């Protein structure tokens, strides 16, 4: 029995050395995010049966990958500053709220993220005179 790859009806059979190597659209675009899956989601989730071009999925995947890398880099820096090895929702919150552009883009509430530390200026004493303990005269 010959080693036949691909199966199918009729036509020439290809041996394993002649088998066509499949390349994904993600690898063609040099991305890690799944271009095919994003294209499928774009097609299935649109309301008015609008046609979705092939490049649209590549653009969306590249934007998502860039934003994810940006947020993870900032969150990793926040975790490193706090000397921990695991990124938590708190680190994500600090990273997103610390970056002006990401803060404008991501207005969502992050569960377990806490709040940013901030004390209003009027509540902070400027140069309050230190009270010296009165000497006990005996």
Swiss-Prot record:
Keywords: Acetylation, Activator, Chromatin regulator, Chromosome, DNA-binding, Nucleosome core, Nucleus, Transcription, Transcription regulation. One of its GO terms (molecular function) is RNA polymerase II cis-regulatory region sequence-specific DNA binding. Pfam families: Histone, Histone_H2A_C. GO terms for biological process: CENP-A eviction from euchromatin; heterochromatin formation; nuclear-transcribed mRNA catabolic process, non-stop decay; regulation of transcription by RNA polymerase II; silent mating-type cassette heterochromatin formation; transcription elongation by RNA polymerase II. The modification N6-acetyllysine is found at residues 4, 9. GO terms for cellular component: euchromatin; nucleosome; nucleus. Its main location: nucleus. Residues 1-21 are annotated as: Disordered. It is found in: Nucleus; Chromosome. Residues 1-10 have a biased composition (Gly residues). Acetylated once deposited into chromatin. Belongs to the histone H2A family. Variant histone H2A which can replace H2A in some nucleosomes. Nucleosomes wrap and compact DNA into chromatin, limiting DNA accessibility to the cellular machineries which require DNA as a template. Histones thereby play a central role in transcription regulation, DNA repair, DNA replication and chromosomal stability. DNA accessibility is regulated via a complex set of post-translational modifications of histones, also called histone code, and nucleosome remodeling. The nucleosome is a histone octamer containing two molecules each of H2A, H2B, H3 and H4 assembled in one H3-H4 heterotetramer and two H2A-H2B heterodimers. The octamer wraps approximately 147 bp of DNA. H2A or its variant H2A.Z forms a heterodimer with H2B. H2A.Z associates with the VPS72/SWC2 subunit of the SWR1 chromatin remodeling complex. Also interacts with RBP1/DNA-directed RNA polymerase II largest subunit. PANTHER family: HISTONE H2A. This is Histone H2A.Z. It comes from Cryptococcus neoformans var. neoformans serotype D (strain JEC21 / ATCC MYA-565).
């Amino acid at each position: 029995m010959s080693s036949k790859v691909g199966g199918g009806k009729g036509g020439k059979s290809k041996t394993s050395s002649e088998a066509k190597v499949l390349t994904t659209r993600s690898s063609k675009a040099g991305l890690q995010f799944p271009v095919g899956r994003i294209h499928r989601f774009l097609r299935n989730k649109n309301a008015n049966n609008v046609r979705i071009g092939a490049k649209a999925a590549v653009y969306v995947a590249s934007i998502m990958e860039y934003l994810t890398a940006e947020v993870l880099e900032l969150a990793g820096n926040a975790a490193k500053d706090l000397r921990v090895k695991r990124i938590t929702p708190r680190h994500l919150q600090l990273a997103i709220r610390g970056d002006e552009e990401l803060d404008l883009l991501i207005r969502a509430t992050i569960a377990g993220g806490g709040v940013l530390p901030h004390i209003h200026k009027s509540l902070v004493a400027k140069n309050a005179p230190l009270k010296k303990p009165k000497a006990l005269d005996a």
